[in-house]
Swiss-Prot record:
Channel activity inhibited by ATP via ABCB8/MITOSUR subunit. The modification Phosphoserine is found at residue 70. The chain crosses the membrane at residues 202-222, 387-407. It is a multi-pass membrane protein. The keyword Transit peptide applies. Residues 223-386 are mitochondrial intermembrane. It comes from Homo sapiens (Human). It catalyses: K(+)(in) = K(+)(out). PANTHER family: COILED-COIL DOMAIN-CONTAINING PROTEIN 51 (PTHR28624), MITOCHONDRIAL POTASSIUM CHANNEL (PTHR28624:SF1). This is Mitochondrial potassium channel.
Amino acid sequence: MMGRSPGFAMQHIVGVPHVLVRRGLLGRDLFMTRTLCSPGPSQPGEKRPEEVALGLHHRLPALGRALGHSIQQRATSTAKTWWDRYEEFVGLNEVREAQGKVTEAEKVFMVARGLVREAREDLEVHQAKLKEVRDRLDRVSREDSQYLELATLEHRMLQEEKRLRTAYLRAEDSEREKFSLFSAAVRESHEKERTRAERTKNWSLIGSVLGALIGVAGSTYVNRVRLQELKALLLEAQKGPVSLQEAIREQASSYSRQQRDLHNLMVDLRGLVHAAGPGQDSGSQAGSPPTRDRDVDVLSAALKEQLSHSRQVHSCLEGLREQLDGLEKTCSQMAGVVQLVKSAAHPGLVEPADGAMPSFLLEQGSMILALSDTEQRLEAQVNRNTIYSTLVTCVTFVATLPVLYMLFKAS
């Protein structure tokens, strides 16, 4: 490599970067290295739709469980929040706190009672020992050497008895104090419970009164709406035959006018036919046939149009007559029903019908009068029911006011 003629020599060794050797003019070698970077890891290709769908299918159960868990936690927290608000509104929290205080006071009182029991037992045991010492002291003569020892022991035991008695009295005082605190906690708990019961009763009473008022208002509104619907129905039933008769009269007048126009047209046509006679000259005879043909065509077209229009009017009149017959039957049936209602309401004023229904024999005037009478009676009945409901509501509210005042004053 050193004997090559080019001025550059390349040396490549496995694991070693390329080294570029350049021989200078003065015989010195200049080394230059070139670092080759290895290519990075090839990026993975895009996933296929099947793999994406499979991964989504595997993730769906976990997502569903997480979503269900979050929804459950949210629902639980919401329900707990509303339940806490309800308990705070009703007063259950105060009652629960008072019951907790009662429990704590009871525990303290039981501890104080145990201390009193122990102090009493210790005092009784010490008094028994002191009695034994006194008995021995009574049996020993004062000249004996044990007398001084027994007297000293008695003196010590008397001091111990005094201390135990003081402790017993203090334990009793503590027991009385704890018992008074326990009694106060019990009274407070009972007071809170009674207040909660009174509050619940008052709110239930207020809710009942409001519910009754809302029910009366709703029934009044429903009765008023029904009365308005009944009025509209009766007015429609009353105005129906009149409007139909007016339509029939208008159609009949238009039909008579069309018949009159048709008759005038026929008269004009006959006049034109008779006017075209043999007294005219040849020139006029030569020029008249096209004119007469045009006049005849125009008149025949007008005649056909009038005939078709008259047929349409006739068919409309037939349809209106059928509708009028059906409406008359319906009105007669309604009149019969009204007659039956009147006979049921006033049995002494209306004679009983023998055999068939007399509804087809009633006239339109009597039917309208019967409908008006029924409307007036129904309106009077609905107004009477509304007045009664209002009076009952007012009386109930007036009777409830003193009770509410007394309850709120007591609470």
